[in-house]
Amino acid sequence: MSKTTEFIKIGDRLVIKPQGADYDLIPGKVYDLSYDRYACDDIFKENGELSLPTKIYTSKKDEFFKKRVLTYFNNAFTDTTGVMLAGTKGTGKTIMAKVLAKESNLPIIIVDPQYPEHRLIKYFKQISTPVCILFDEVDKSFDTEKMLDFLDGLQKTSKKLVIMTCNNLHKVSEYLQDRCSRIRYLRKYTTDDNLEFLDILINDMGIKNVEEVSKFCRENIKLLSMDNIVAFLNEVKMLEDEDTTLDEIISVMNIEHVQPKGVSSEEEPIDENDKDDEDDFDIEPIDYDDYDD
């Protein structure tokens, strides 16, 4: 009778060998790491590929930053390269995080915001394959001081590219920010970064009067996030053959914008010609004696 091995030895402990086939992490493939709090167990599974727009708009700063990060990671002797991308929503940091991850040509592990920080070091120390680890919005979901412990604990393991995004850098531990050996690269995004390719975006969408629309966006949209820009340009494209001004288009959209002169942000403008005569609103006093029995 053939004999099968049912146990593995870890230190002085014997553990029943789990069933299943051997599996190697695949470069470029996305994996999700989450935690089942009821079963007190990690959940690690495949998740296809990163979702990216068909066309990605990046600035010269983005290209320079990306090249520096990947060049260093590919040539560095250190085991972990930390990257922080900070900025308001819609400024491009999440797209850059995905682009960096994809172009690293590493297996990509996205860590669930609810995953316990104290388990991170132990889990990733078990992975000997070089990987890219993504943390989204660390300022909202993780204790960033503990993230420094995590980066410290990853040293002397296999090479790992750790990419973090945050909306508010002020909410990130100053100790994490000021440790270049852990977070080596920091890119701060502002809405002004989107201005670099605004005209290209307008032109790509086939909108007429590129200069006029570009000038209007720059002068009137208060938060030039990609979400606001694209939403507004879609409306412009849809209505450009109608007799509708850019001010009228943006006036009913959920985009904070500069009000045209003479228009209060609190109420609709009043056309003096449409005002009713004050006499029309006069009400004759009631003589209550008429109602006496």
Predicted feature locations:
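Hydrophobic positions in the central parallel beta-sheet of the AAA+
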Residues: 83, 133-136
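Pre-Walker A (pre-P-loop) alpha-helix and adjacent loop at the N terminus of AAA/AAA+ ATPase modules
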Residues: 44-82
